[in-house]
Amino acid sequence: MRRREVLLFLTGSRVRHVRTGVDSLIGGYRLNLTPSEPLGLWRIEALHRPVSIGDLVFFCPPMTAVFDEARRRGYVRRGLCAGGVAPLIKTVAALAAQNVEITDHIVIDGRSLPSSVVRKTDGEGRVLLPDPGGVVPPHHLFLHSSFASSYDSRYFGPVPDSGLLGLARPVFTFDP
């Protein structure tokens, strides 16, 4: 009888834990465990205006071969977005119709983007292929993080704005 009580308790605890996690996801909260932005709890805030350069946003990556490879390499975590990946937090660096040049760093409409060195290899020595750059297509965003090893539009290119979930607002965060 004692074993059954313990199993019921553990099952109930697990259900409560999962329920709390699901409620947080539905409630617009996300846990950031990547160094691209401060670690901790973030909230997704609905965007009631057009997205702007400098906005820190959550977005769901599109289901593309580039993101399939990113998931295989461990650049993106598993999550609830289409394709089974977690939403990413990035800063909007360029909007549709802006020209992005990608060489050893990023230049947007003739102006260098700070903290935008383009790496040739990742932390494990694997080749990183930069996006070729060009004009950001309609309904797309070029996203960036100032974290040197960030996986962002330097490598995956502009993303459809349909994947935009909202503004990223820190709730309880810290820099490692």
From Swiss-Prot:
GO MF term (any one): serine-type endopeptidase activity
Q: What are its GO biological-process terms?
A: signal peptide processing
Tell me, what's a Pfam family for it?
A: Peptidase_S26
The answer to keyword Signal applying to this record is yes
Segments forming a coiled coil: none
Q: What is the annotated localization of this protein?
A: Periplasm
Q: Which NCBIfam families match?
A: PRK13838.1, TraF_Ti
Q: What is its main location?
A: periplasm
Q: Which cysteines are joined by disulfide bonds?
A: none
- GO (cellular component) term, any one: periplasmic space
**What's the superkingdom here?**
Bacteria
User: Which UniProt keyword terms apply here?
Assistant: Conjugation, Periplasm, Plasmid, Signal
Identify its protein family: Belongs to the peptidase S26C family.
* Name of this chain's protein: Conjugal transfer protein TraF
Q: Per its UniProt record, what InterPro entries does this chain match?
A: LexA/Signal_pep-like_sf, Peptidase_S26, Peptidase_S26C_TraF
Sum up the protein's function in the record's words.
Answer: Involved in conjugal transfer of the plasmid.
Which species expresses this protein natively?
Rhizobium radiobacter
Gene (name only): traF
Q: Which SUPFAM superfamilies match?
A: LexA/Signal peptidase
Gene3D superfamilies for this protein: Umud Fragment, subunit A
